[in-house]
A protein has these predicted regions:
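Short, glycine-/small- and polar/acidic-enriched structural segments
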Residues: 1-57, 63, 73-77, 90-96
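Pocket-lining segment of extracytoplasmic ligand-binding domains
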Residues: 53-138
C-alpha cells in the first residue's frame, strides 16, 4: 500500500481523530486528487452536513504553511510534505492510499494514455535509482 494522502492537523490542535473535525474548517485543493482523498477521509468519519471545507492553494507546501498560520484547522498533504509535517510535530488523523487509477475523458487516445503511463513508470524508476538527485523538486 502506498500512502497517497494524509489528513493533517498542526501540533497545537486538539484534534486526534477525524471525527473531531466535524464542523471545523479543512483546507482542500479543489479539483485535485488530494481534495477527493480528503473528502473520502472526512465522509468516512463525519456526517456529510458536518464536513466543512474551504478552497486552499494547490501547492502542498503552501497549504501546509497556511494551516500552520491558522487559515484552516486541517489540510490534506502528500509526500514529502507528510514527513515534513510529522517532523514538525503535526499529527496525521487519517491516511488513504492510491487506488492505482487515473482519470481521463472518453476521447483520450489510448496510445497517448499508454505513453503517459510509460513516462510515469520511467520517472519512478529514475527517482528511486537516485533520490538525492531529485529531492530538490519536492
Amino acid at each position: 500500500m502506498i500512502v497517497c494522502a494524509a489528513l493533517v492537523v498542526p501540533p497545537h490542535s486538539n484534534v486526534y481523530v477525524p471525527q473531531e473535525l466535524a464542523g471545523r474548517m479543512v483546507g482542500l485543493d479543489y479539483g485535485n486528487g488530494t481534495a477527493y482523498a480528503g473528502l473520502q477521509m472526512l465522509e468516512g468519519a463525519v456526517r456529510r452536513d458536518e464536513v466543512t471545507t474551504c478552497a486552499a492553494v494547490i501547492h502542498p507546501g503552501e497549504r501546509y504553511a497556511a494551516m500552520l498560520r491558522g487559515a484552516f484547522e486541517a489540510t490534506v498533504l502528500q509526500e514529502p510534505w507528510i514527513t515534513v509535517a510529522e517532523k514538525a510535530g503535526c499529527r496525521l488523523v487519517s491516511t488513504t492510499f492510491f487506488h492505482g487509477t487515473w482519470v481521463a475523458g472518453p476521447d483520450l487516445d489510448p496510445a497517448l494514455y499508454a505513453a503517459f503511463l510509460r513516462g510515469v513508470t520511467q520517472a519512478v524508476r529514475r527517482i528511486n535509482a537516485d533520490k538525492r538527485r531529485y529531492v530538490s523538486y519536492f
